[in-house]
């Protein structure tokens, strides 16, 4: 789980770890890339990161680096933006799914993961 919003990471980590999944949270993509040796099955990745006074990689840059390391890892991209052209761009890049950060985030992530792995969480 990679998101610079502590509310989102806490919500997702609590929900899915309570179901028995091992989940780690990172604030920024660079931290996630550094942990790729752990061979995750899935990465939930924010589309936009902000860090005052520092240059950080955006979600697409992180995705590209992740895929250089492991082409088989599944990636769900999160965003507060609900734009059709963004969804198409992400699909062309090879993102496995796209979930909007809204009031249905947990349910939508659950559905996405279920579809990707073929099981209920």
Each language-model region and where it sits:
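Alpha-helical interaction/dimerization surfaces of two-component signaling modules
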Residues: 14-19, 89
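Short amphipathic alpha-helix used as the core "switch/output" element in two-component signaling
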Residues: 34, 54-71
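Alpha4 helix (beta4-alpha4-beta5 surface) of REC/receiver domains from two-component response regulators
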Residues: 57, 61, 81-99, 103, ...
